[in-house]
A protein has these predicted regions:
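Short proline/glycine-enriched turn/loop motifs at strand-loop junctions of beta-rich domains
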Residues: 64, 107-108, 295-300
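Conserved aromatic anchor
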Residues: 286-298
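Flexible, surface-exposed loop/linker segments and immediately adjacent secondary-structure boundaries
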Residues: 83-87, 92-286, 301
Length: 342
């Protein structure tokens, strides 16, 4: 017998009919279009007993010779003699960043990674780094966890590049950037604590940035190069690469689509989460079957099975035009179900 628990309250998907390319980015976050003046921006470091310009530059800036830049900016006559409590200005453009990693916490079916070479199979607890590419096959699922607890899940036929995973040493500011080149990625982002923290997902035409929310980005690489964004919790700014400073805010339970050129469509309310017609049905047949209470505006239904209540360890999914989903060869066990209208 197979036990199934339905989990629908946290997922609401839109019937978005336009063929578009979408992405999200808060204007204040988007890093690709920072003005040249940002190179002159500084942050303050309070000197401590025993500090020298050499030490400060070595700890917090990018190059060994950056002490000379510190001396020039701050007018320090003696680089080896700094009084404690002095407010030193450090140039933001030269702040040193340390590379972070991500961890694979769930993998099912065909899931692979490439680190500048050939693809190799992914396994649970594998470590991913900046520059890695992750892809799933027709039956593959993978979920990765970032250092702050953010989760990103790839369903079948998806590909995600880890473009930047960094932390600024002095300020602790996080900089995470990903590029979705095929399929979908579901993200549950831990709320960003610092003003300059950045979390972005890019498609070939748009960028999606948030400060703490749950949302999905889908890029249709095989079709019309459209990108779709659905916001499940919080707020996301949506803009094309060329209009990133003019973001359209999309709130929870709304979605947006844009053209491949980055023109953003108006937010559209998502459909209500579907319910099972027979939630107490005992699944004791060879095929596991779910009947969905039909929604008048739905064109179809997306049904997923997971091993865990958080729906991070997904292992099967299907899309159906009819309000019935059938899964074959599901081992006996207790599973969790997610249904979305499309």
């Amino acid at each position: 017998m197979t036990g199934i628990t339905q989990r629908t309250a946290t997922l609401r998907t839109a019937a978005l009919r336009a063929a578009c390319a979408v992405a999200c980015a808060f204007a204040a976050q988007h890093a690709a279009a920072q003005p040249p003046a940002a190179a002159g921006k500084t942050v303050v470091y309070r000197t401590q007993a025993g500090d020298t310009l050499y030490d400060v530059a070595a700890r917090y800036l990018q190059g060994a010779d950056d002490w000379q830049l510190l001396q020039q900016i701050n007018g320090v006559p003696a680089p080896k003699h700094l009084q404690p409590g002095v407010a030193l200005k450090l140039p933001v453009a030269r702040l040193r960043k340390e590379k972070l990693t991500a961890r694979v916490i769930a993998v099912q079916g065909t899931a692979e990674r490439a680190s500048g070479g050939a693809f190799t199979a992914l396994a649970n607890d594998a470590t991913l780094a900046e520059g890695d590419r992750v892809r799933t096959g027709p039956n593959g699922f993978v979920t990765i966890e970032l250092a702050d607890g953010t989760h990103m899940s790839l369903p079948p036929d998806s590909q995600l590049d880890l473009k930047s995973l960094r932390r600024t040493v002095l300020t602790g500011t996080l900089d995470r950037e990903f590029e979705l080149t095929r399929g979908s990625v579901d993200s549950e982002v831990t709320h960003l604590k610092k003003r300059d923290d950045r979390f972005q997902i890019r498609s070939p035409s748009v960028v999606a940035g948030v400060r703490g929310t749950r949302f999905r980005v889908n890029y249709d690489a095989a079709g019309n190069a459209s990108t779709r964004v659905e916001v499940l919790d919080g707020t996301v700014g949506v803009a094309g690469h060329r209009q990133a400073a003019d973001a359209t805010l999309v709130h929870a339970n709304f979605g947006s689509v844009s053209t491949a050129s980055g023109a953003v469509g108006a937010p559209v309310e998502l459909l209500a989460p579907p319910a099972l017609a027979h939630p107490d049905k005992v699944q004791d047949e060879p095929d596991v079957t779910f009947d969905v209470a039909p929604l008048a505006q739905a064109r179809g239904y997306h049904v997923q099975l997971a091993h865990d209540a958080g729906l991070l360890d997904l292992f099967r999914e299907t899309r159906t035009d009819a309000p019935r989903a059938v899964f074959r060869d599901v081992p006996n066990g207790n599973y969790f179900l997610r249904i979305a209208a499309i």
